[in-house]
Amino acid sequence: MAAPGTPLSSSATQAISVSTVDAPSDPLLSSQSAQLDGHSSWDTHMGGSNGIGSRAPSRANTPGQDQMPLTIHSAAQRGDLPAIMRLVDSGRATVHDRDDDNITPLHWAAINAQLATCRYLLDHGAQVDALGGDLIASPLQWAARNGHVYVLELLCSRGADPTITDSQGFNALHLTVHSSAVMPLVFMLQQPSLDSPEGLDSTDSQGHTALMWAAYQGDAISVDILLKHGADVHKRDGAGLTAMHWAVVKGNRLCIRLLADAKADLLAKEDSGKTPRDMAIELKSIGAYRKALADIGLEEDGRRKQRTFGASTDRTARLATMVVPFVALGFIFATFAALPWYTAAPFAAAELFGMHHIVTRVILDPHEHDFLQRSNYFLAIVAGSIAWVGWEWVHKLASATPGYASNNLFFALSLIVCSWNLFRAASISPGYAPLVPSALHRREIVTQLAQQGRLNGQTYCVSCMARKPMRSKHCKLCKRCVARHDHHCPWVANCIGVGNHRQFLLFVGALVVGVLQFLYLTVVYYSINAPPYDPLPDSSYETCHLPFAFLCTATTFDAFLLGVALWAALQLTWTVILLVAQAWQITRQMTTLEVSNLGRFGFMGGKGGQSYAGQTNFIAQHSGRGQPSGSLSAATDRLQGIHKQFGENENAEIDVNLGADESADATSTHAHAHGSHSKLNLLRRVFASSSSWLLSIVGLDLYTRGKAGEGLKRASAAANPFDHGLLSNCKDFWSRGEDLNLDYTTLYDLPAEVSPGHCQVVPFLVDTVTAGGRGGAWRNRSPASGYSLLRSGADDDDDDSDNATMPVDAAGRRKWSMWSNLKKSAKPPGSATAILPTSNATHA
């Protein structure tokens, strides 16, 4: 049995199969849950032992607790700074004291995010890199394992060394990745000692890099961040496994896609000769592997797909997509002109389906990620419709409606304004936030935000790796942060932001006015030129079968024009709503996104707890697998608690707490309990799904998603620091911020020109606590609801046999696990059973 600190064998990584459906259990992670308010999640482990030889102080209300002796270590756990000061000033303790487990007060303060306590201890001479605990780790490593970003910043500013390794070979970067905390990872990667390839790709005792750990955990955001900083996708561990091999072990589609897009070697073989594809077949994650490669246009063997029109965003595909809707709409209108309407309708539906099939299955690649949203398909439909309306006006209405010159002139102006602003809204930049020019500049930004206690998802974008301006949002389709982001509009194939919002509003307004003028001129055209409809005397031979005589007249005289007019009238159903909503929002100095957030989350700036959710990364990680998890439920409960802490609606919707399987179970249970209504419920679900899709297509889903509609009610009473009245708001919109002397692309703080008296300040969610140290959102967390995002297939009890180096599932198959040998290394010499560390305390 290996003693702690002994180099670990790579035999734990030998290939065997594991199901990618059930999330395996990581005993090391579950044992390393956070120490909160001095309460150890492993107080009762091994008959009350905490795994390091003594029981950690607990805050449970037990008889005689008040009589327990106060030590500097228990005070540091609780963040009781006055008690620490009394102990130090009286000489009863020093900042260098170690407890029975060789742990310093700074370790306990760091693991519990007691920032003020950490600062006091360091100011009074505490050793910043003191090593202690069973795993012989530093305070920086304790804080890193729990993702306490502001403790990390304090320790690093006092000279803590991120490259120090514990007895398992983990440095601060590895442990930050283990925490799945995003902002701490961003901060750690800015440290000079980790910025070089040697630091970024440093390995643990088994040769695993931080990228391998992130891939193994299915942590797509951490994988993306590491790749953006230059992590090596070709590096191998002690068993010859690359990061792609470990991503396949987890079966996370997002991680596999990111690594493949970063040119990872898909044909790399580990020591036993298996490629990532071979392992995917063996571990039953081949489905995720295939879909991940298809997302970026690759075949299963890694070859680029050979398509006639190339990728969905290629120039050839975009040109073909622009042509097909125009031609298809012409065929549809011609069908109505050639056949009776009741015969033409099914043919027109078939032609419409054919158009959609050609675009989405022949021209575009349906297997690419977000292929339809990233294409110009809907822009082509709008442009083709405008072209046919203009053709009918030039070809028929302009010359056949004498006496209506003013209406024709007004329509011509509307057509020109609409077409030009559609082109401008689709082609110009929506107002992207600037990217950092260099890694040095990025380091300065991250360090400054961390020092200010503002390094979170609302101020820093981990996708752009740049500062995020106020009122901006990162668009996953445009892959940039858009200043004063309104929404991503499929009809212009572009984001709507400060740079093109004015053109978008002119386009929608001119479209509504132009359609109304076109419909009026169409009615005049039929009134002047079409002979009155004369129905047949014998109704049994009637061919019109329409409710209004005017429609019969129009179909008899010029059905092609009628088809174009009805198609144009159909667009009024959503453009009028959109125009009214946009005009109202402009007068209130709000965007569509802000109105939506106001209804769903209670304030304009974004999601309550957004920075915390972004740091813990539980949404992205579990959506990649689409499976329910106990840790996900625990995290969701904590997020709901944060919502309540901010005074938001207790019934606020959180869409991440129900996995696919769990949702299906709930549906089936409901159907069983109400069998007589099962068909009705099915129809309701189909209607809800289809209506949701239609709303997303026309861009109105932001008003209906969850409780977004309530934003329209709350907006009138919402505190908005940018709202300066109707006239000023309209001038600011038209001048793109110049009227308020603002540059929205670089607006990081409220300027003096914007009155702070209008603003209701929402505090940032940080993992720091006050000098009292009693906890905020951390306080009520029980050990049972441990927020574990790192799991493995190993069982809680190890087989003592030296031959049983790999865990085995119920079917007798061995499992892949990066933790297997680490568990064995945690056994003390001569121990018959492994005493696993059950908190970051033993990660010392």
Curated annotation (Swiss-Prot):
Q: What is this protein called?
A: Palmitoyltransferase AKR1
Transmembrane segment boundaries? 319-339, 340-360, 378-398, 409-429, 504-524, 560-580
Tell me the residue ranges located in the Lumenal compartment per UniProt.
399-408, 525-559
Functional summary from the UniProt entry: Palmitoyltransferase specific for casein kinase 1.
Q: Where is this region: Disordered?
A: 18-67, 789-810, 822-844
Q: Could you tell me which InterPro entries the record lists for this protein?
A: Ankyrin_rpt, Ankyrin_rpt-contain_sf, Palmitoyltrfase_DHHC
Q: Name its cellular compartments.
A: Early endosome membrane; Golgi apparatus membrane
Q: What is its EC number?
A: 2.3.1.225
Q: Where is the composition biased (Polar residues)?
A: 18-35
- The catalytic site is made up of 489
Alphabetized PROSITE patterns for the sequence: ANK_REP_REGION, ANK_REPEAT, DHHC
| Its membrane topology | Multi-pass membrane protein
Q: Name one GO molecular function term.
A: protein-cysteine S-palmitoyltransferase activity
ANK repeat boundaries on the chain: 65-96, 101-130, 135-164, 168-198, 206-235, 239-268
Chief subcellular location equals membrane
Q: Among the entry's GO cellular component annotations, what is one?
A: early endosome membrane
Identify the enzyme class. transferase
Catalytic activity from the UniProt record: L-cysteinyl-[protein] + hexadecanoyl-CoA = S-hexadecanoyl-L-cysteinyl-[protein] + CoA
| Species for this entry | Mycosarcoma maydis (Corn smut fungus)
Question: Taking every annotated instance into account, which residue ranges of this chain make up the domain DHHC?
Answer: 459-509
Domain commentary: The DHHC domain is required for palmitoyltransferase activity.
